[in-house]
A protein has these predicted regions:
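Bacterial Sec-dependent N-terminal signal peptides
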Residues: 1-26, 32, 391
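Surface positions of alpha-helical coiled-coils, especially the charged/polar e/g heptad sites
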Residues: 23, 30, 37, 89, ...
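Periplasmic alpha-helical coiled-coil/stalk elements that build and connect Gram-negative outer-membrane
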Residues: 117-230, 317-320, 324
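Charged, solvent-exposed structural "stalk/scaffold" segments
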Residues: 23, 134-183, 197, 326-378, ...
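Sec/SRP-type N-terminal targeting helices
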Residues: 39-43, 56, 88-118, 165, ...
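A small-residue-enriched
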Residues: 29-89, 226-290, 294-300, 311-314, ...
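Bacterial Sec-pathway N-terminal export signals of envelope proteins
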Residues: 19-62, 87, 95, 161-165, ...
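Long amphipathic alpha-helical coiled-coil segments
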Residues: 194-203, 241-244, 248, 302-305, ...
């Protein structure tokens, strides 16, 4: 378990350091220890272990006692006593034991899958929190610039250098940005509540404003990890379970055995000894073997379908990840050669560009900054979805 947690943390948060890594590590540990859904899943796993062992033992023995009064009394009284144990055919217990082990293994896989989804959700909330922190910082800077521009334009109005239209434009821009800022604050609060819920009610403070570096992907290695992952194992073990249930159905159709001790006493005469019996398999388990064989065929088809769908989905997600990375690279390259908002504001204040040009250009620049942050967020969320197989 400890080794798995270390792998989770390394793969999930691998390329960040310092306080950011500590915050991420704290969140994941809290989720593993305090998350309510995981607590329920652990208890469900224990219940499944106990359920898997039910019905794997022989039936209870039967004890008989009879006291019969004789008539006429000269015959004396008759006392009968017997102990009988019925057993299924021996191979049935072998197959029941195998079925039990497979069910326990599947219960563990189901817990691991639940843990995967919970840790993935925690990872995605962490990424979203960083994204919202970045948006808050970006909007704060943008608001400061808009406030400066509005003040500058109002001074120009007093000096008669601009008209009311320019003042209205500057005020409209400021009001629009204030609305966006309030929306981001609301989203931050919603995300904070979601983080508290997923960490079992514990307050989690995430102030990160830097995304972790993307983890390099090796498609063949990732595909193999999915083929050996919990979902794939669950399907393969489902097939194994149906095969063992088929073998068990065959064993249950074989004769049942009965052995016991019996005694009969009348006056001074007593008979004691053992008795054996065997059932005649006729109609009690009719069609159960045919049904079990049909279920095996169904499970084989389900494994084949899942394997194909899983490979296709992984390849599609890898392609989507590659597309997002290209978008990020293009925008980052474009921003490297673009004028910053502070330079635009300086140019406007010095009369190098008009107020309308500043509004259009700065808004275009700002919207693309937001788009870049969204691309980076989507990239990391897609990456987290792909890497959940290692959780």
């Amino acid at each position: 378990m400890k080794t798995r947690i270390i792998i989770v943390l390394c793969l999930t948060f691998g390329m960040i350091a310092g306080a950011e890594a500590q915050q991420a590590d704290t969140l994941m540990k809290l989720v593993l220890e305090q998350n309510r859904e995981l607590k329920v899943a652990r208890e469900a796993y224990q219940v499944s272990i106990l359920e898997a062992g039910i019905g794997n033992t022989p039936a209870d023995p039967e004890v008989e006692f009879a006291y019969l009064y004789g008539k006429p009394s000269d015959l004396g009284n008759r006392i009968d006593f017997g102990v009988t144990q019925q057993l299924d055919f021996p191979t049935a217990y072998i197959h029941r034991s195998k079925v039990k082990n497979i069910k326990i293994s599947r219960a563990e896989l189901e817990y691991l899958l639940t843990r995967q989804e919970v840790l993935l959700a925690a990872r995605q909330l962490w990424i979203e929190q960083i994204h919202l922190n970045q948006l808050q910082t970006l909007l704060s800077e943008r608001l400061q610039q808009a406030e400066t521009i509005r003040t500058h334009v109002e001074h120009q109005l007093e000096a008669g250098e601009v008209g009311l239209l320019e003042v209205s434009q500057s005020r409209l821009m400021l009001a629009s940005l204030e609305g966006e800022y309030e929306e981001v604050l609301a989203l931050l609060e919603n995300n904070r509540m979601a983080l508290i819920e997923i960490s079992g009610g514990t307050q989690v403070e995430i102030k990160d404003t830097r995304f972790p570096q993307p983890v390099p992907m090796i498609p063949d290695t990732l595909l193999e990890a999915y083929r050996q992952g919990p979902y794939a194992q669950l399907y393969h073990q489902g097939l194994q379970l149906k095969e063992e249930e088929k073998n068990l159905a065959v064993s249950n159709h074989l004769p049942k055995l009965m052995a016991g001790y019996f005694s009969e006493s009348v006056l001074d005469v007593a008979f004691r000894g053992f008795r054996l019996g065997v059932s005649v398999p006729l109609w009690e388990n009719a069609n159960t073997v045919k049904r079990a064989k049909s279920e095996v065929a169904y499970a084989e088809a389900a494994v084949d379908r899942y394997t194909y769908q899983q490979d296709r989905e992984v390849r599609q997600n890898l392609k989507k990840l590659e597309t997002l990375q290209l978008r990020v690279n293009k925008l980052e390259k474009a921003f490297g050669s673009a004028n910053s908002l502070s330079l635009l504001a300086f140019a406007m204040e010095n009369g190098e560009i008009s107020l309308s040009e500043y509004f259009y250009t700065s808004d275009f620049y700002f919207r693309n900054q937001q788009q870049l942050l969204r691309y980076k967020r989507d990239l990391l969320i897609q990456e987290a979805e792909l890497l959940k197989v290692y959780l």
